[in-house]
Amino acid sequence: MEKEDLGLEITELRLGLPGAGGENNTDKDKNKNKKRVFSDIEGENSSSEEDGKKETKNQVVGWPPVCSYRKKNTVNEPKLYVKVSMDGAPFLRKIDLAMHKGYSDLAFALDKFFGCYGICEALKDAENAEHVPIYEDKDGDWMLVGDVPWEMFRESCKRLRIMKRSDAKGFDLQPKGSLKGFIEGVRK
């Protein structure tokens, strides 16, 4: 008895893809095992447009595909995300400066992020506060938040840091009433 008579060809171990068959495949079987694109299925009978389809298959136009509403939203509004860290807080936050209209909105957002660490009291009483908000500009210099106009701050800010006053002395950054515009926005 031969193997074909017993039906053992299904359980036979081969190198290759399952269902690919042996070496005695015909051209019809080889074409059957290849994957087909939707355009191949749609236009199987029309051979006149075959050359044009082969050229368009090789082109990858918009990959990865992005929804049109997402394209519109990302093009119109640039995002200005900045990392915010606070001394004593075990986590960092990211804040979008483009969403805020001024220092008062930023102060309110920081109060929401770090309210449990007493940032509200620190921002209200800048002269006696335990914490001082500072930022790093494009040049790598640390400056007090509120020293420059809001638009200049938005353009130059790379990251924000709320540090302890004792550490800010090392940077030679001490608030002298310069945070009044920043502090007025903190609401309770």
From Swiss-Prot:
UniProt induction comment: By auxin.
Keywords recorded for this protein, A-Z: Auxin signaling pathway, Nucleus, Repressor, Transcription, Transcription regulation
Subunit: Homodimers and heterodimers.
Gene source species: Vigna radiata var. radiata (Mung bean)
Recorded superkingdom: Eukaryota
Pfam family name, one: AUX_IAA
Positions occupied by motif EAR-like (transcriptional repression): 13-17
GO biological process: auxin-activated signaling pathway; regulation of DNA-templated transcription
Compartments (UniProt record): Nucleus
UniProt remark on domains: The N-terminal half of the protein contains two conserved domains I and II. Domain I includes a slightly degenerated ERF-associated amphiphilic repression (EAR) motif which seems to be involved in the activity of transcriptional repression. Domain II is required for the correct degradation of the protein through the SCF-mediated ubiquitin-proteasome pathway. Interactions between Aux/IAA proteins and auxin response factors (ARFs) occur through their C-terminal dimerization domains III and IV.
Region (Disordered): 16-57
Record PROSITE patterns: PB1 (PS51745)
Record-stated family: Belongs to the Aux/IAA family.
Function: Aux/IAA proteins are short-lived transcriptional factors that function as repressors of early auxin response genes at low auxin concentrations. Repression is thought to result from the interaction with auxin response factors (ARFs), proteins that bind to the auxin-responsive promoter element (AuxRE). Formation of heterodimers with ARF proteins may alter their ability to modulate early auxin response genes expression.
Name the UniProt record assigns to this protein: Auxin-induced protein 22C
PANTHER family assigned to the protein according to its UniProt record, in alphabetical order: AUXIN-RESPONSIVE PROTEIN IAA17 (PTHR31734), AUXIN-RESPONSIVE PROTEIN IAA5 (PTHR31734:SF87)
GO cellular component: nucleus
Domain PB1: 79-167
